[in-house]
Design a protein with these regions (language model features):
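Alpha-helical structural modules in large enzymes and assemblies
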Residues: 1-209
């Protein structure tokens, strides 16, 4: 399958290195059409029926699904932003003051990103979908009717019946970005604590009774 795909290399996902995570998603983000065509070719030519079925399913139900394309665009943008700062923080000469500023800047970026970027993400995903001849719309999911509980309000019901697009924005996009912000805030607080400790140690060292 790799022989059918040029440019970026498909890589297994690393659980430890941000750059590896970005590279893995980047390969899919920018070669989705090539990957899909390669999977379809495998489904038509491989002698193993199980492999043919799996390849066809991946090409049709994953890469041929607009929701999957949106998810890949989201992950690529989020991981790229984190990886850029992560690489800067790994510099041997990185000062704690600069590290604090870098993390604080990334938190500010994601705070704005969560409020303004979803429409742009959809446009990027639609462009990819059109190139792949994939319908740039979300599949309608079957709604499960249930009785309203005694403690539920009409507002609760409206949330339950929100559109697929809004559901993905709230339950997927915002969830990912909010997790990133929470993790970065924790890192920021750790750096702030280290900075205060260093200042205290310097003051103690320079203190002459």
């Amino acid at each position: 399958m790799k022989d059918n795909i040029s440019g970026f290399t498909l890589k297994p996902l690393s659980a430890t290195r941000w750059e590896s995570r970005v590279d893995s998603v980047k390969a899919i983000r920018f070669q989705m059409q090539d990957i899909r065509e390669a999977l379809l070719e495998v489904s038509d030519t491989d002698n193993d029926a199980a492999i043919c079925t799996e390849a066809k399913s991946l090409a049709t139900n994953e890469l041929g699904d607009f929701e999957f394309i949106v998810a890949i665009v989201i992950w690529y943008e989020v991981l790229s932003a984190i990886n850029l700062v992560s690489k800067q923080l790994q510099a041997k000469d990185m000062l704690i003051d600069i590290a604090v500023e870098k993390v604080q800047g990334l938190i500010s970026f994601f705070t704005k990103y969560r409020e303004t970027s979803f429409p742009n993400i959809l446009e990027s995903a639609k462009e990819i979908a059109r190139e792949m001849d994939v319908e740039p719309t979300f599949r309608t999911k079957r709604k499960i009717k249930r009785k309203r509980q005694f403690d539920e309000t009409p507002e609760d019901e409206s949330i339950a019946s929100q559109s697929t697009e809004e559901s993905i924005r709230i339950n997927y996009f915002l969830s990912i970005v909010d997790q990133a912000i929470a993790s970065l805030t924790k890192r920021f607080e750790q750096y702030q604590g280290t900075k205060k400790l260093l200042v205290f140690c310097l003051l103690q060292r320079n203190y002459v009774p």
